[in-house]
A protein has these predicted regions:
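Catalytic PLP-binding core of fold-type I/II PLP enzymes
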Residues: 34-66
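Active-site-proximal loop/turn and secondary-structure-junction residues that shape catalytic pockets
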Residues: 28, 59-61, 89, 211
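Structural preference for beta-strand elements that scaffold enzyme active sites
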Residues: 21, 52-54, 82, 202-204
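Alpha-helical scaffolding segments of alpha/beta enzyme cores, especially the outer helices
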Residues: 37-48, 71, 75-78, 147, ...
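Short, small-residue-biased leader/transition segments that mark boundaries at the very start
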Residues: 1-2
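Active-site C-terminal subdomain of aminotransferase-like
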Residues: 18-28, 33, 70-159, 164-168
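Conserved C-terminal alpha-helix-loop-beta "cap" of PLP-dependent enzymes
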Residues: 150, 155-223
Length: 223
């Protein structure tokens, strides 16, 4: 939180936007994870400066189900002030479940309504999460996607490809040359992530609840 200290060291800080919250994602956009120790350290500093810690959990299931994680759902609830459980990336039609770990803000329902985010049939969102958290379905879906992502990772490494980074979740970032990139664009849906150099690009593949093992094998054949 060096930024926070430097912020108040500036005598004109009142003319600036006041830092009000720390916002992180778990997993991150790169599929990487925070460790429990890292979350503890971040939350300790947040409390020191009386700033809430919010965790973006759009891909939370894939973080909790990762083989190498040491962060559980109860851990997360203790180490932040609010987080949300993403639904769409594990098969829900829409919606997220917001979790306030201490005390919900006053008039939260009204605030949601004022921002045009209140569904007339809110139970449609609730039913989805009730189903996802019945019989451990949420974790089963997440583990399925990670298992297939690991098959993809092992396959591309065996073929001699390099990874942009080592992601333990359902997102895999593969570096391909320009020729292979152009070829794949005609056959496969993926995200163009970043140019590694003039001749290579990192592309992202994300497995999900809907991915089948034969899909991964077909992709590996194209690669």
């Amino acid at each position: 939180m060096l930024f926070r200290s430097n912020f108040y060291a500036d005598e004109t800080y009142e003319h600036q936007v006041i830092p009000g919250m720390v916002y992180i994602s778990h997993p991150t956009e790169y599929g990487t994870l925070y460790t429990k120790a890292e979350l503890e350290a971040i939350y300790t500093i947040c409390k020191e400066y009386e700033m809430p810690l919010f965790v973006d959990g759009a891909r939370l299931g894939y973080g909790l189900a990762a083989d190498d994680t040491d962060v559980t759902l109860p851990d997360l609830a203790k180490l932040c002030d609010a987080f949300y459980i993403g639904g769409t990336k594990v098969g829900a039609l829409c919606g997220e479940a917001v979790v306030f770990t201490k005390k919900a803000p006053k008039f939260f329902f009204t605030t949601v309504k004022q921002h045009g985010a209140l569904l007339a049939k809110g139970r449609l969102v609730g039913i989805q999460f009730d189903t996802l958290f019945t019989d451990d379905l949420y974790m089963e879906i997440s583990k399925h996607a990670i298992r297939l992502a690991n098959i993809l990772k092992a396959g591309v490494l065996a073929k001699g490809y390099k990874l942009l980074l080592d992601s333990p979740t359902n997102q895999q970032f593969i570096i391909v040359d320009n020729e292979k990139y152009a070829e794949l664009k005609k056959q496969v849906a993926f995200s163009t992530w970043e140019k590694v150099d003039a001749d290579h690009t990192a592309i992202r593949f994300a497995t999900s609840w809907a991915t089948k093992e034969e899909d991964v094998q077909a992709l590996l054949e194209l690669l």
